């Protein structure tokens, strides 16, 4: 798909143009200075056209200086239907772009097996996407980009930094989403598109086949609508790409400064890509793009409050002069050509994780640390916690540390006063605080009619039921509270205290006995006693 109407690839055309440039300079030098002038002109021409300076020839740097920092703006996506199912598509510059949100497997545990290694079965092998670039009737995609974005912890308040220190050095994502962005070129598929209703409908059908293929592998996937495409671009920094605050080394948007780096060809591997989630940044955007010729590229965009002075890793190369184009390559639009990026052959395996790592619970019997997600991007989640306050409050504040906005609905606000923080609200009404993503309620047994006061019931009830209901709700009960089998099936995650610091965790059909990790830095959030500051003398 890189060939042009001339029949030559862009690289061949540039090589021919470079030879002609050197020839013209040599001829001019010969006319002005004879043999010495010709030799000097050839040396200067080769240095300007062919010699690599910091990864690119001098003429390429000149082009970036003149044209690299331009705002990138696209048409609005539209909604089209195919096979009685609708989806969003953007047609821009001869390319139709569609997207699929990869939801993966719900509530799958992540185990920390070492100081820099984690294990999870909620993953996707990018190499397996290569066959999905070709479709019936010789329809071929330009590329598929696997865009993963999120952050290790929250960015508001003091506790997220404490939680980050508790996690330590392993790769961890408190928030993480994965999207597949597919680009269908029109000119390169002229023959195949003759048999299609429209370019947009053909792109929608491609996205539907990709989503169906992923579902057959047990990975939930959802076709994006036009609203989803626009919202995804906004979250990935479309304001920075379309704005004028563009520097040579970074671009600025409403959420902060964005700097994009390229992975060298020899560094693209599963282990290296996972290390992106060790970075302390407001947000990390990782982009792995697969091409039909079995090659790939990888970039990482880091969002920080101020421009990053140096790359976060020695293996990363900053894409100077083309930061806006590099950030636009993460979005739902035509993929721009990045001069500072080189393709490499696909490795035998290139695994990347899907969804958040989860909330830190504690240690297993073999010494591994267990993390369980309490939220899910695709479905509503219910979590049951039967434990005393020293454990229940730790779980709640760790959800905040992971980046969620929590609202506690309680009639006993003094009980929860110690956990109050910027991203955790305590209310006594059913209406949650604005932008709440996780609700916390207290468990109360339903009493039978004519009961003599004993708390025996037939079902789960809560003291205050949040309305409207957040996507995830955590129900807090006293230790020893038991659930009937029917009620237990209503919860995706259960955490039950069986000893002073031991809990039984159940999620996704699996069960673990975990020793809860009690960090001293969290004591001020779980204690009922007021915390005072002492001034050293």
UniProtKB/Swiss-Prot annotation:
Pfam families according to UniProt: EccE
UniProt keyword Phosphoprotein present: no
Localization terms from the record: Cell membrane
Residues passing through the membrane, by range: 31-51
Keyword 4Fe-4S attributed: no
Disulphide bridges, residue numbers: none
GO CC terms in record: plasma membrane
Predominant cellular place of this UniProt entry's protein: membrane
Record's bilayer topology term: Single-pass membrane protein
InterPro entries: EccE_dom, T7SS_EccE
Keyword list, A-Z: Cell membrane, Membrane, Transmembrane, Transmembrane helix
Coiled coil: none
Subunit structure, as described in the record: Could be part of the ESX-2 / type VII secretion system (T7SS), which is composed of cytosolic and membrane components.
Family: Belongs to the EccE family.
Protein's UniProt name: ESX-2 secretion system protein EccE2
């Amino acid at each position: 798909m890189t060939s042009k109407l001339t029949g030559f690839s862009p690289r061949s055309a540039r090589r021919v143009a470079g030879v002609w440039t050197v020839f013209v300079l040599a001829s001019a030098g010969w006319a002005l200075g004879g043999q010495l002038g010709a030799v000097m002109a050839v040396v200067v021409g080769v240095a300007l056209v062919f010699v690599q300076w910091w990864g690119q020839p001098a003429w390429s740097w000149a082009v970036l200086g003149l044209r690299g920092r331009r705002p990138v703006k696209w048409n609005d996506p539209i909604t089209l239907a195919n096979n009685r199912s609708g989806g969003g598509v953007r047609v821009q510059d001869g390319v139709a772009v569609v997207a699929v949100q990869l939801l993966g497997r719900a509530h799958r545990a992540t185990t920390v097996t070492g100081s820099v290694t984690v294990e999870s079965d909620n993953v996707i092998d990018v190499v397996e996407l290569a066959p999905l670039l070709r479709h019936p009737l010789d329809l071929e995609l330009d590329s598929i980009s696997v865009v993963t974005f999120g952050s290790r912890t929250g960015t508001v308040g003091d506790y997220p930094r404490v939680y980050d220190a508790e996690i330590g050095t392993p790769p961890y994502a408190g928030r993480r989403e994965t999207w597949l962005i597919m680009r269908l070129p029109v000119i390169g598929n002229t023959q195949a598109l003759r048999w299609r209703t429209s370019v947009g409908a053909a792109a929608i059908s491609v996205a539907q086949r990709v989503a169906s293929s992923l579902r057959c592998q047990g990975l939930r996937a959802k076709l994006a609508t036009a609203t989803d495409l626009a919202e995804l671009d906004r979250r990935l920094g479309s304001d920075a790409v379309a704005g004028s605050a563009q520097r040579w080394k970074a671009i600025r948007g409403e959420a902060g400064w964005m700097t994009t780096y390229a992975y060298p060809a020899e560094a693209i591997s599963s282990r290296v890509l996972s290390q992106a989630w060790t970075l302390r940044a407001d947000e990390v955007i990782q982009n792995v793009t697969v091409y039909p010729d079995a090659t790939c590229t990888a970039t990482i965009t880091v969002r920080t409050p101020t421009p990053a002075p140096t790359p976060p890793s020695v293996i990363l190369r900053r894409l100077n002069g083309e930061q806006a184009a590099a950030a636009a390559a993460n979005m739902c639009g035509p993929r721009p050509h990045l001069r500072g990026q080189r393709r490499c052959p696909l490795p035998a395996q290139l695994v990347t994780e899907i969804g958040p790592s989860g909330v830190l619970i504690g240690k297993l019997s073999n010494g591994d640390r267990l993390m369980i997600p309490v939220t899910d991007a695709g479905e509503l989640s219910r979590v049951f916690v039967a434990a005393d306050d020293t454990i229940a409050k730790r779980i709640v504040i760790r959800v905040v540390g992971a980046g969620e906005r929590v609202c506690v609905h309680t009639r006993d606000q003094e009980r929860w006063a110690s956990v109050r923080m910027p991203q955790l609200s305590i209310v006594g009404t059913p209406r949650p605080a604005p932008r709440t993503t996780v609700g916390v309620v207290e468990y109360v047994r339903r009493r039978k009619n004519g009961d003599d006061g004993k708390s025996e019931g037939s079902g789960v009830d809560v003291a205050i039921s949040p309305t409207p209901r957040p996507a995830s709700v955590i129900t807090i009960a006293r230790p020893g509270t038991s659930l009937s089998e029917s009620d237990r099936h209503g919860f995706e995650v259960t955490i039950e205290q069986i000893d002073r610091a031991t809990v039984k965790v159940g999620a996704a059909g699996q069960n673990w006995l975990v020793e809860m990790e009690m960090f001293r830095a969290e004591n001020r959030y779980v204690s009922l006693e007021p915390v005072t500051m002492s001034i050293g003398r």
